[in-house]
């Protein structure tokens, strides 16, 4: 029997590619994918659950890249921000939250304004609007008079023009308490994560009340933006025209109710003057108390909810076993194969290498469905022979799927198919075993049955494919993947990894 300790493994995480039989709007089924066809026919594979309770999210909640990579790396179900926060929401514990209360007491003491900012969306990927509504309730119960809400439009994790219902719910509660909707910005500006600070600063300026784009009410604002073919994600940072509205100024305090950190850090940096980035705003502001819903890595804030700690992810177990490791992705997903795969910690292991292939800086990946996939495969072919465990990410199906352009998403899947054929061919020639999975669904539902674009993630299962034809795999969930790989390598998993291997023996 071959000594598995000499085996090398490449784990490919495809971003945003689920399994669905229906062809309507299904870029995966409609694409020409000769290599995928070959793999599903000739290689062992199984179904993997990547959403809802299987990844520590509420029942039926679609998966996402952060949660997916956390679960893959941890080898256990990771109860993330949404689940943790929802528990307190259901138990009406927001009113007892120490961080919230510290902010509120400071606002009362200084007769300042509390600013609530974040993605107002039912999506549950970066935020959940119900959290905002509960915080508003708490602010009122605690006697705050001056509360301003700064709305970030979604249109990416939910339908492109779906914010109307969120505004209706928000207006009902702000009118009830005489609070204000002070500014509106699309997440394209307020939640950039690619260090394009020209975008972030436009959202920042709107928070301070500096914008030439103004609105009298949200309904008029929506009509104007939509008439210019601007969807929720791309709302021009705009401010309430009323002279009575309080914008962010020195001495005020902020609660940023986004729980996911990656798209919250740049704007937070500008507001509190952190040292995380070099970019500084032209008009800095002094915030008294800044509370983030969860920890934003690299930035010091009050933290409302502490995340579950992952102490022994696959990277650490592999390091202790003496394995050389390679992590590889393009800019858009680099944090996912490093920070999130390692349990929400930025760590470089001994005998490891990280390679980030630069993502193209474009307005829409619909026009560039190739993204940087070729560069990722090229780097893998150059480097993987020197490493025992390689973990990489292909971003195409997710990032192009988010555009809702079916033809482009089909092209993205076809490009991925070709790059996987190159990767597996290289691996087989060098006695490296490949495992291929995905972190969540997306590209398999790019349009609905009426042809309307669908840009959000899905709750469909994904695949786990292996190039080792001697294996048999059973169905499972993302948290089973690390135990499966360690089992294949004859490495004992850590006791924290309480999920089993999917290899049938």
Curated annotation (Swiss-Prot):
Monomer. The gene is gpmI. Catalyzes the interconversion of 2-phosphoglycerate and 3-phosphoglycerate. GO terms for cellular component: cytosol. Belongs to the BPG-independent phosphoglycerate mutase family. Mn(2+) 1 binds at residues 398, 402, 457. Signal peptide: none annotated. Substrate binds at residues 126, 156-157, 187, 193, 260-263, 333. Binds 2 manganese ions per subunit. Its cofactor is Mn(2+). The keyword Hydrolase does not apply. It catalyses: (2R)-2-phosphoglycerate = (2R)-3-phosphoglycerate. GO terms for biological process: glucose catabolic process; glycolytic process. It comes from the Bacteria. Its EC number is 5.4.2.12. It is an enzyme of class 5 (isomerase). Pfam families: iPGM_N, Metalloenzyme. The active site is at 65 (phosphoserine intermediate). This is 2,3-bisphosphoglycerate-independent phosphoglycerate mutase. It comes from Mycoplasmopsis pulmonis (strain UAB CTIP). InterPro entries: Alkaline_phosphatase_core_sf, BPG-indep_PGM_N, Metalloenzyme, PGAM_B_sf, Pgm_bpd_ind. GO terms for molecular function: manganese ion binding; phosphoglycerate mutase activity. Pathway: Carbohydrate degradation; glycolysis; pyruvate from D-glyceraldehyde 3-phosphate: step 3/5. Keywords: Glycolysis, Isomerase, Manganese, Metal-binding. Mn(2+) 2 binds at residues 15, 65, 439-440.
């Amino acid at each position: 029997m071959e000594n598995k300790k000499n085996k090398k493994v490449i784990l490919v995480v495809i971003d945003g590619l689920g399994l669905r039989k229906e062809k309507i709007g299904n870029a995966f089924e409609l694409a020409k994918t000769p290599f995928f066809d070959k793999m599903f026919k000739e290689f062992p594979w199984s179904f993997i659950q990547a959403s809802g309770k299987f990844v520590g999210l509420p029942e039926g909640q679609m998966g996402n890249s952060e949660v997916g990579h956390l679960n893959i790396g941890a080898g256990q179900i990771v109860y993330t921000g949404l689940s943790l926060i929802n528990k307190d929401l259901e138990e009406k514990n927001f009113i007892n939250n120490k961080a919230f209360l510290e902010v509120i007491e400071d606002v009362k003491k200084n007769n300042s304004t509390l600013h609530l900012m974040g993605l107002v969306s039912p999506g549950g990927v970066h935020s959940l609007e119900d959290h905002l509504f509960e915080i508003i309730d708490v602010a009122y119960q605690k006697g705050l008079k001056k509360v301003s809400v700064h709305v970030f439009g979604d249109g990416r994790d939910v339908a492109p023009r779906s914010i109307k219902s969120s505004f209706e719910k928000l207006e009902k509660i702000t009118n009830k308490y005489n609070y204000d909707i002070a500014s509106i910005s699309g997440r394209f500006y307020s939640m950039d994560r690619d260090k394009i600070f020209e975008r972030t600063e436009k959202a920042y300026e709107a928070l301070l009340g500096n914008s030439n784009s103004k609105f009298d009410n949200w309904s008029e604002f929506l009509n104007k933006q939509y008439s210019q073919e601007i969807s929720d994600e791309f709302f021009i940072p705009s401010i309430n025209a009323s002279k009575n509205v309080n914008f962010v100024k020195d001495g005020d305090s902020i609660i940023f109710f986004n729980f996911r950190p990656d798209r919250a850090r740049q704007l937070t940096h500008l507001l509190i003057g952190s040292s995380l980035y070099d970019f500084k705003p032209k008009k800095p502001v002094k915030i008294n108390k800044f509370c983030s819903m969860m920890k934003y890595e690299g930035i010091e804030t009050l933290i409302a909810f502490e995340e579950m700690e992952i102490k022994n992810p696959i990277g650490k177990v592999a390091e202790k076993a003496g394995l050389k490791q390679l992590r590889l992705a393009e800019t858009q997903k680099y944090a996912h194969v490093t920070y999130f795969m390692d349990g929400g910690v930025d760590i470089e292991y001994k005998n490891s290498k990280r390679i980030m292939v630069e993502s193209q800086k474009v307005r829409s990946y619909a026009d560039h469905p190739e993204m940087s996939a070729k560069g990722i495969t090229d780097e893998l072919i150059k480097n993987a022979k020197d490493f025992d465990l390689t973990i990489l990410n292909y971003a195409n199906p997710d990032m192009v799927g988010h555009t809702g352009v079916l033809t482009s998403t089909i092209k993205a899947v076809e490009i991925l198919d070709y790059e996987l054929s190159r990767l597996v061919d290289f691996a087989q020639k060098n006695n490296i075993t490949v495992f291929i999975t995905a972190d969540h669904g997306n590209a398999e539902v790019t349009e609905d049955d009426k042809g309307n674009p669908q840009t959000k993630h899905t709750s469909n299962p994904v695949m786990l494919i292996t190039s080792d034809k001697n294996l048999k795999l059973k169905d499972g969930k993302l948290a089973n993947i690390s135990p499966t790989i360690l089992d294949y390598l004859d490495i004992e998993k850590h006791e924290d990894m309480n999920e089993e291997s999917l290899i049938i023996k």
